[in-house]
Amino acid sequence: MGQKTHPLGFRIGITRDHKSSWFSNMKSYPKLAQEDYKIRSCIEKQLHNASISLIYIDRKVDQVQVHIHTARPGIILGKMGRGLEDLRKKLETTLKNDTQIRINLIEITDPDKEATLIAEFIVQQLEKRIAFRRVIRQAMQRSQKAKNQGIKIQVSGRLNGAEIARSEWVREGRVPLQTLRAHIDYSYKTAHTIYGILGVKVWLFKGEKIITDKVDN
């Protein structure tokens, strides 16, 4: 049986960075890791329609900086910036400690270059009961317009309400999953339909990164 490696974890330290940036001793590490999980879960639950592709967490001694990469910053800001303040208070309540939280919004100018946002688009269309092949074709066209070098989409489950679940995938361009220097963006989402849950996976190939760091002998 072939073993599948997670395309993002496989490239950490080469073409990808960790989604959190902080150091801790062994005693505090589990607590801080759990806090990161709570922050991400709270943001994703409250802002599920804000087209968020990445939540990056940076910690200092008594401060947590949360960088939210979003294609729709207006939804997070709300009227007169109240939405951002409400989110900050909600996060402070969730953590239940005296840690100061600062939120920084980073706007995504081209959402079709983000695997997470393409996967979200596919999920939204599938939940509206649009035929999966048509949805995949639309996603492929959007990726082509964004000039990605390659894209692979896989949809699994009871496709179009079929009795037996199956998987179908389509690839266009190059998606070199075994090349470590390849800049691959990956996302997995689930669509909840009347026939059950459909799994959606998207791989995007954005080009190769030249690795310049050399180890001195």
Swiss-Prot record:
Organism, by scientific name, is: Gracilaria tenuistipitata var. liui (Red alga)
Q: Which residues form a coiled coil?
A: none
Q: What is this protein called?
A: Small ribosomal subunit protein uS3c
A GO CC annotation recorded here is: chloroplast
Tell me if Repeat is a UniProt keyword of this record: no
Subunit structure and binding partners? Part of the 30S ribosomal subunit.
Localization annotation: Plastid, Chloroplast
List this protein's GO terms for biological process.
translation
Just give the chief location class. plastid
